[in-house]
């Protein structure tokens, strides 16, 4: 098994760890979860689903059950990436499973990440694979930035 890690890249935390049965919880953050070795079971909003990847919106009750390590992308609700996930991946749903082949590719991409530079490259590739790169470059309101 790979060593656990946590990397902050831009406004996301990328966490690889193995938590076999965490308690169901909810918080003010969205998640993307990817299998690193084999599919996991997610319990989301009372529904059990087996997946290689899942997007979970903010304030949605959830837990992921897996003996194998997973990659969890923790995304604060107030960030541009959270808006991208809502618009591109969730599309109005509280959660949505992600394409298996894309999810497997993301898990594979992160398998050998060990440094900040590796993490930055893997995060950019993850955004590209999920179609989040273009959406993320939305213009900020300059009036807010000046305040």
Region locations from a protein language model:
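N-terminal regulatory/effector-sensing and dimerization cores
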Residues: 2-92
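General nucleic-acid-binding
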Residues: 72-120
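A short, Lys/Arg-enriched amphipathic alpha-helix from helix-turn-helix/homeodomain DNA-binding modules
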Residues: 102-106, 111, 115-147
């Amino acid at each position: 098994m790979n060593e656990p890690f946590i990397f902050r890249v831009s406004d996301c935390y990328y966490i690889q760890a193995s938590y076999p049965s965490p308690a169901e919880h909810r918080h003010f953050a969205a998640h993307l979860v990817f299998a690193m070795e084999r599919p996991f079971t997610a319990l989301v909003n009372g529904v059990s689903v087996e997946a290689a990847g899942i997007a979970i919106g903010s304030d949605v009750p959830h837990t992921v059950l897996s003996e194998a390590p997973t990659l969890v992308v923790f995304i604060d609700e107030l960030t541009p990436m959270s808006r991208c996930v809502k618009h591109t991946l969730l599309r109005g749903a509280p959660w949505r499973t992600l394409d298996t082949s894309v999810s497997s590719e993301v898990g594979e991409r992160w398998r050998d990440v060990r440094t900040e530079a590796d993490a930055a490259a893997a995060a950019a590739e993850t955004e590209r694979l999920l179609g989040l790169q273009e959406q993320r470059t939305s213009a900020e309101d300059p009036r807010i930035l000046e305040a």
